[in-house]
Amino acid sequence: MHQAASHMKKRTIALIAILAALLTACTGKTDYNTTLVQADSLMASRPDSALHMLQGISTKNLSTKADRAYHALLLTQARDKNYIRQTDDSLIQVAVRYYDTHEDAPLQARAYYYWGSLYRDQNDYSGAIDKYAIALSHINDHPGNAELKTSLYSNLGYLYYTQGLNSEADSIYQRAELLAKSQKDTTSLCYTLSQRGMISLTQGKNYYPKAEQQMQQALSIGKAFSDSMVLVPIYHSLSMLYNLMPKPGQALQYARLNYSGLKDTLHCYRTFLLLGNAYFLNGQYDSADIFLQKILKAERYYDTKADACMRLSE
């Protein structure tokens, strides 16, 4: 009887030890997952806090490939959101390889998006376009993921536009416009309409009325929500358009609105050019000269300085 009780006690102790070990292992893994998920939840509102949390996690303590991939993705994302320029893609490739193998479409798309952003920051725009396009292909037909789709449309559209691929840019912006309307995302809608207006502007005089309609629609929506961050670039685009049409009074009106909405009015050299051109167009040559001369003090902005010099020579 005593031996049986002793044997039972040993078995119970052994079982408790095994359960404790399993619980410790599970708790350790869960803790790290919880930390990663918490960092992810902070990414939009407090990216600096998310970065601090992620930097405090040692990869040696991440016991699974899933955790290491998630950490690699989040750390790359946090650096991007904190405007830290990244030149080494070895970290994000950890995430890309894992999610490609496990075919997790939303996380695949996210990994390729931040891989593309790394190329973008290195001014490798063709590489960025390639990665962004792959990212979009993973979630194009999936419901949801609106925020990531919006970011992809915005970046792809802008890169196509800067590369002179206006047809591709406008196609992407059309999709962005539909998404923004469906999500009632007025900020993205204003940006998209304004960018489509800029594309129309570059297509020549016959497209100026279309450009005006798109930009004024963006302005109307933006004014309804009184967001200066949205309105300022629209004012800039409209002033450029009216300078070309030409409609001198409106060109000057929107150039002034653009200038008054800026936080930095000491180094806004492109706005100085906008104002200089608008004042010149209105025959106010002294005012034009004041703003154009400001541009010549810039250390960079060589194209803007060249345009200012051409206008001053007139």
Question: Each PLM stretch: what is its role?
Answer:
Residues 2-14:
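Bacterial N-terminal signal peptides that target proteins for export
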